[in-house]
């Protein structure tokens, strides 16, 4: 484990770093820099598994960390080891510091959305100057791939009604003859969607404030914030921070629905 600083010396990650020189050129599936990239993946739920599996397919050196060593995570860990993930640490103590990857410092952390900005491993990564991405950020960078269609992204967030609206958007697009899928925080993990061999015309993404907090370069075809009410203040630290996370969906969008 790296990072001698105590928790008291660290601060919650309110403005996560997007890139370093090592990650700045990782903007397509075919970018050569994925191979050998040292990545720590936090969380081994559906999202974390998808992230680790994708990165292993790209040739990255991956260490996964999760505090839950229950049977479901142990089964997932075994599968990830088979596909080439270097190490899976299922121990609460392992979540308290930033692990090395192949005996060296990590280049990148990709976090599951449930991990809070005041989690010790994430604070240590930020203090060390590492980029911290969501699965959505990773998927956005991987969306272009030689020989595959590049889908348009339609992104929806808000305090209430996200799942209903995204499911409706998916149905409307399919009725119009387009190959579409509801993904992100609902349905199919977004990394599974972009790896689909047939590809999609449109991804209808439900995005949580947790995912948006760790997302940096997203530039969708269209975006909407359905509504905004006080929620998840304990995770974000304040209502202003919660609203700012939701507002990131508009930062680079081509069409904003307000």
Which stretches of residues belong to each language-model region?
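N-terminal leader/targeting and accessory segments in enzymes
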Residues: 1-134, 138
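Phosphate-binding loop of NTP-binding sites
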Residues: 97-104, 113-257
């Amino acid at each position: 484990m790296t990072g001698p600083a105590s928790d008291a010396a660290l601060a919650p990650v309110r403005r996560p770093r997007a890139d370093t020189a090592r990650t700045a050129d990782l903007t397509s599936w075919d970018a050569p820099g994925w191979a050998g990239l040292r990545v720590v993946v936090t969380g081994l739920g559906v999202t974390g598994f998808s992230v680790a599996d994708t990165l292993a397919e790209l040739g990255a050196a991956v260490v996964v960390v999760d505090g839950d060593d229950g049977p479901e995570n142990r089964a997932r860990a075994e599968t990830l080891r088979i596909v080439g993930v270097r190490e899976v640490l299922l121990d609460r103590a392992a979540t308290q510091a930033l692990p090395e990857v192949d005996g060296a410092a990590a280049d990148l952390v990709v976090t599951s959305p449930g991990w809070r900005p005041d989690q010790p491993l994430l604070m240590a990564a930020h203090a060390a100057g590492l980029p911290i991405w969501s699965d959505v950020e990773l998927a956005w960078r991987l969306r272009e791939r030689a020989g595959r269609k590049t889908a348009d992204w339609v992104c929806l967030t808000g305090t209430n009604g996200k799942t209903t609206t995204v499911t409706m958007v998916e149905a409307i697009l399919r009725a119009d003859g387009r190959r579409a899928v509801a993904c992100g925080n609902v349905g199919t993990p977004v990394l599974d969607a972009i790896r689909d061999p047939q590809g999609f015309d449109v991804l209808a993404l439900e995005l949580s404030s947790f995912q948006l907090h760790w997302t940096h370069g997203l530039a969708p075809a269209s975006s909407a914030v359905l509504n905004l009410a006080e929620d998840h203040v304990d995770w974000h630290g304040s209502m202003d921070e919660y609203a700012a996370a939701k507002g990131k969906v508009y930062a680079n969008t081509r069409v904003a629905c307000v």
